[in-house]
UniProtKB/Swiss-Prot annotation:
Heterodimer of a B chain and an A chain linked by two disulfide bonds. This is Relaxin. Belongs to the insulin family. SMART domains: IlGF.
Length: 54
């Protein structure tokens, strides 16, 4: 799967993706993650966006 694929994921699906990309979910930078979560849900994001927050 390409790192540029646009992913529209919300809730559990987003968490599942996060674990797949990062290996685990630690919610340290909460504000930034919430912003990204909303973006991923509404307009989509790419795997690189999520990987940056690992």
């Amino acid at each position: 799967q390409s790192t540029n694929d646009l992913i529209k994921a919300c809730g559990r699906e987003l968490v599942r993706l996060w674990v797949e990309i990062c290996g685990s979910v630690s919610w340290g930078r909460t504000a930034l993650r919430m912003t990204l979560s909303e973006k991923c849900c509404q307009v989509g994001c790419i795997r690189k966006d999520i990987a940056r927050l690992c």
